[in-house]
Swiss-Prot record:
HAMAP family: Ribosomal_uL14 (MF_01367). It holds the Pfam family Ribosomal_L14. This is Large ribosomal subunit protein uL14. NCBIfam families: rplN_bact. GO terms for cellular component: cytosolic large ribosomal subunit. One of its GO terms (molecular function) is large ribosomal subunit rRNA binding. SMART domains: Ribosomal_L14 (SM01374). GO terms for biological process: translation. Belongs to the universal ribosomal protein uL14 family.
Amino acid sequence: MIQEQTMLTVADNSGARRVMCIKVLGGSHRRYAGVGDIIKITIKEAIPRGKVKKGDVLKAVVVRTRKGVRRPDGSVIRFDGNACVILNNNSEQPIGTRIFGPVTRELRTEKFMKIISLAPEVL
């Protein structure tokens, strides 16, 4: 469960290390975002010579949460931290060319197939 002010790690090579959620997209009073939801983020920590810089405001898709994801069979997949993949503001395609760490099968929609194909492991 990601809400405003939540700090997340970045699971791609866009150049950002830590980001903060500033808005959960999809509804006027939507409070939480889970795996597969798009959020608005600001870059809090970035590496030198990256594709993004500190202070940039972009969109991101949540790929891992500590809260986890509940499957129809009743199982829950939880992770050690909250992570996201940074997206282009217009096309909503990933900025980075590599994804680090596992992602869940819930991302397997038309919009996020690129993330699934780049990920080293799909749970």
